[in-house]
């Protein structure tokens, strides 16, 4: 079904709004994936706080203009499935990576984070906020209090020598 100009403008505005507030973006090709599998992917995306939409390439290019995801414009060839992570930068990449393991026809084209194209695998392995805090606490716990005090004292001594 052909879209009229108002529908196209609405789609561009909706995707642009999602892109403006997103932490990261992922573009994928979903040719050959069954409708049932795509429905389950959309459900998982909603649960993970990921905005996901199939958009025509020309509309996708216009939608990302003026956002940090302009770097993805070259990847809009063939059928494009756009996903924007709203809650965690790696959410969309992790979701697509897991989905691609189960569906061989699903292909991740590109991912972007902070205005640059990045590897989707790297983006997918970013720790969540809770995981990062747990890692930090584990590192702090491993260092004994004495080592920490000596390290802080050494830094203080270096700063005092630099001032003198």
Swiss-Prot record:
Taxonomic lineage of the native organism: Bacteria, Pseudomonadati, Pseudomonadota, Gammaproteobacteria, Vibrionales
Quaternary data: Part of the ribosomal stalk of the 50S ribosomal subunit. The N-terminus interacts with L11 and the large rRNA to form the base of the stalk. The C-terminus forms an elongated spine to which L12 dimers bind in a sequential fashion forming a multimeric L10(L12)X complex.
Task performed by this protein: Forms part of the ribosomal stalk, playing a central role in the interaction of the ribosome with GTP-bound translation factors.
Any one of the GO CC terms: large ribosomal subunit
Keyword Aminoacyl-tRNA synthetase: no
The organism of origin for this protein: Aliivibrio salmonicida (strain LFI1238)
Cited InterPro entries: Ribosomal_uL10, Ribosomal_uL10-like_sf, Ribosomal_uL10_bac, Ribosomal_uL10_bac_type, Ribosomal_uL10_CS_bac
CDD domains for the chain: Ribosomal_L10 (cd05797)
UniProt-recorded name of the protein: Large ribosomal subunit protein uL10
One MF term in the entry's GO annotations: large ribosomal subunit rRNA binding
Gene3D superfamilies according to UniProt: 3.30.70.1730, 6.10.250.2350
Record-linked Pfam families: Ribosomal_L10 (PF00466)
Keywords: Ribonucleoprotein, Ribosomal protein, RNA-binding, rRNA-binding
